Regions:
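Intrinsically disordered, charged and Pro/Gly-enriched terminal/linker segments
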Residues: 1, 5-9, 29-39, 45-52, ...
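Short acidic, hydrophobic short linear motifs in intrinsically disordered regions
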Residues: 53-61
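Short, Lys/Arg-enriched N-terminal segment that forms or immediately precedes the first helix
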Residues: 18-31
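DNA major-groove recognition helices of helix-turn-helix
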Residues: 24, 39-46, 59-60, 76-90, ...
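Long, low-complexity, charged/polar intrinsically disordered regions in eukaryotic proteins
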Residues: 9-17
């Protein structure tokens, strides 16, 4: 157990879902961490950043494209503060270094999309599919979200094809059927 220096108890586990039904839980209790679409997009953008760090100016523009630069920066500062407050206890879920921000990668905070990508990177398609709850941020039509959603969907389909092929090669027909059904849920027109 991590102890919050302010005297409270830090959470044992924080789970954030960005794939499928968006939501969050702290120690198994549902919490409104992702109560707004912008908060969900912020967490997704930070956790999916290729090199980890994202320029603050870029985040501000992406999240508030219709606001002037000063207002967008102010809004981002408030949103980052809200994110930090919504997940209790140390360590902080975001790192800020001057003009850059990144997701801290704290082991107590599990993000489904990070678990999905990590499992694929480690050659574990079964674990990846276990983390894939559906489309990234359903209903969000930001260009970067749509592109990332398609990329993740394609990776999930490839993982399911590998699992189905391995099950077929091993004569595990029930597994083949299960993987094929899941594949068709994700990609109904897949052949």
């Amino acid at each position: 157990m991590v102890v919050d220096p302010a005297g409270g108890r830090a959470p044992e586990a924080v789970t954030i879902r960005l794939l499928g039904e968006v939501g969050a839980a702290v120690d198994g209790r549902v919490v409104p961490v992702l109560a707004t679409p912008r908060m969900s997009r912020l967490v997704a953008r930070l956790t999916l950043a290729a090199d980890g760090w994202v320029p603050r100016e870029q985040l501000a523009r992406e999240l508030w494209p219709d606001s002037d630069a000063a207002q967008a920066r102010t809004n981002l500062r408030k949103l980052l503060h809200g994110l930090r407050r919504s997940i209790p206890g140390p360590p902080d879920v975001v790192d800020v270094a001057g003009p850059r921000v990144r997701w801290s990668g704290c082991p107590a905070v599990r993000v489904d999309v990070v678990a999905f990508r990590d499992a694929l990177a480690h050659g574990d398609p079964a674990a990846a599919i276990g983390s894939y709850g559906g489309e990234l941020l359903p209903g969000c039509d930001d260009e970067w979200v749509v592109a990332e959603r398609e990329r993740l969907r394609h990776q999930a389909v490839e993982a399911l094809v590998r699992l189905a092929d391995a099950a077929a090669a091993g004569g595990r027909d029930a597994e083949v059927v299960g993987h094929t059904r899941r594949l068709l849920e994700i990609e109904p027109l897949h052949e």
